[in-house]
Amino acid sequence: MTTTLPAYDEVVPRYEPVIGLETHVELGTNTKMFCGCPTDFGGAPNTRVCPVCLGLPGSLPVANRAAVEATIRIGLALNCSIAQWCRFARKNYYYPDMPKNFQISQYDEPLCVDGYLDVEVNGEPVRIGIERVHLEEDTGKTLHVGGATGRIHGATESLVDYNRAGIPLVEIVTKPIPGTGAMAPEVARAYVTELRDVLRSLGVSDVRMEEGSLRCDVNTSLNPPGEQWGTRTETKNVNSLRSVERAVRSEMIRQASVLDAGGRIVQETRHFHEETGDTTSGRSKETATDYRYFPEPDLVPIAPDPTWVAELKAELPELPRLHRRRLQQEWGLSDLDMQSILNAGAVELIEATIAAGATPAAARKWWLGELSRRANETGAELADIGATPGQVAELQGLVDAGKLTDKLARTVLEHVVAGEGSPAEIMAARNLEVVSDTGALTAAVDEAIAANPAIADKVRGGKVAAAGALVGAVMKTTRGQADAKTVRELILERLGAQG
């Protein structure tokens, strides 16, 4: 039976959404959570493994201190209380991606609890409660062969790569978020965006959603206004900020259509499809009882020294909200401008470019324009694109000095990125400097006027807009190395016209 889906703006007046988010963050440690295997991305399948992460009999885990420290720093940045005593637990389930048939996680005694993260949505502050931040190990990666787009449906066989098994993973769980109404999808996206920025500022993870180092599960439920919260569903592994927003919106619409038809919502996991924006049923949702948690007998409890925790708190960097506020005041930026910089990961690059002598506007122009475009085209990180903040500041200095036009500067920048030298060296070696010889420019202008008498007459007659064609002719003659403004002024002067 085909169900007609309601429009989104019809959902919220009749139902109140409650959302919650669970994010898994791969920590950027050198070794895995409970063994010494490297955590580098890639490598031939099943080559970065050992008896511990393969769960072989007789192997014993040892907790990674660097992962514990990173988790405490995350908890402090999220305003959590750090437990005086916590322990690991076994989460029991049978699936090929975890060869031990259990995952080492934390259950009733996590490392960090009861925090919050403040976000802004449409200029309105929203405080998101944090239930817990705990440590666990990642699973292996399953590849389904023969099915559609790598899914298990229709697959003829499944392969498992255990290189990822045992990588330190932090799970950050929000408290239920009611009362957001129609803004629920935007609130979800704002939370994940802010969390990503916090994690990036801490340097604990590269937080690349597209590579799986930041994975998000979205819980959604609806209830009629004033009534008990509804049954929630969990949309798994949403892998982009845009998809977080779309997944909440899609699930709200779907649940409303089920409730409108007199049906009931089943507690289950669902899969979000990027291409359609829809969710489809996965499996019934397990409860904690299904996993039969019990304390991990092979690991001692962790009792962070209060002095150590205090030192970590004192060493926290300036967090994104405070950083944005300071930069906006110093640079005169709008919220949108600041978010663009953060999304591009360009804050430090722009700050360094300004420190090297460029204006905030010029620094933003290059890093968010030409260099971001090139990074997107090549898939490189902006910081690894091949241009340094000092070179960008030097390039802008040549523009400000009238030695390069913006167009010529873009050409020079291409060669800078290619590693050919500094902007000044490239400008000289490739003869790209703006033509400043007045005699040569005047000759080029006179040539353009002589070659285009009809246009010249229009300009003499007061139609100065027609001078653009003459400017173009001069720019062609000088191979784009003349300053267009100077050329236009010279044309009007030669034709006795007023601009």
Curated annotation (Swiss-Prot):
One of its GO terms (molecular function) is asparaginyl-tRNA synthase (glutamine-hydrolyzing) activity. Keywords: ATP-binding, Ligase, Nucleotide-binding, Protein biosynthesis. It catalyses: L-glutamyl-tRNA(Gln) + L-glutamine + ATP + H2O = L-glutaminyl-tRNA(Gln) + L-glutamate + ADP + phosphate + H(+); L-aspartyl-tRNA(Asn) + L-glutamine + ATP + H2O = L-asparaginyl-tRNA(Asn) + L-glutamate + ADP + phosphate + 2 H(+). GO terms for biological process: glutaminyl-tRNAGln biosynthesis via transamidation; translation. Its EC number is 6.3.5.-. Heterotrimer of A, B and C subunits. This is Aspartyl/glutamyl-tRNA(Asn/Gln) amidotransferase subunit B. It comes from Salinispora arenicola (strain CNS-205).
